[in-house]
Amino acid sequence: MIPATGPLVSTEWLAAHLADPDMVVFDATIYLPTEAKDGAAEFVACHIPGARFFDIDEIADPDTELPHMVPASGRFARLMGDLGVSNSSFCVFYDQKGLFSASRGWWMMGLFGHDRAAVLDGGLPKWQMEARTVEAGDPPPVAPARFRPDFRASRLRGIGDMLENVDSEEALVLDARAGARFRAEAPEPRAGMRSGHIPGSANLPYNDLLATDQTMLPPDRLRARLAEAGIDGSRPVITSCGTGVTATILTLAMVRAGFAPGAVYDGSWTEWGSRPDTPLET
């Protein structure tokens, strides 16, 4: 069995464990509506050997108009089983940007009780920069497996929770969007949304936690950045972003820095900013 790791693994580590029987590698790429790319098509064109595609839009709740919301436990279990994931699998997630959406896959595994998961630090760009082997084409079929979820409700927040928190200020809300979006100085990439942020929230753009090569900063530097944003371990933390994807980069950083994972506001600004009845600040 592959030994437990931290929330991040290096390209060297993955290369050494790529052929292990319990290893499952996922490309969890998703692109913004303003980006003229398709994650699944790019995966077929180039991926780490043996990787499968983790479709964030498919492994989601089909009964809401909000993008890639967390599915019910039964749906998640079925889809992960179809992808060949069992409770003994070790899942490594990467994406085509470096570190953007891979953390969403890692976070979902933890949400459903599976801690044998990690993010590939630097993702596909670092793998390719090091001239490691890649392949193209559709992946071969995999044998179905049985995955038993153990849902951790404490790691997820809905809009009702967030409205209550505006009044109570019990939890610190960290917003991973760019500063200009947080301050309503730049439009949202999805049409029809107001600009601004949840009252009382703090801004920590996810890019501030990454080095220039899209690897995550070391724990000591993460702790410094998180402290500047108000994280000292005294209050619970809820992360948010545009659609609940880059919020999980903040979650990943907190775990890497030695803090509890906190919770993610799944609907994030796409839900909050599209409703006329939610308060906001600019």
Residue ranges and their predicted role:
Residues 1-282:
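Cytosolic catalytic domains that perform sulfur/thiol-centered chemistry
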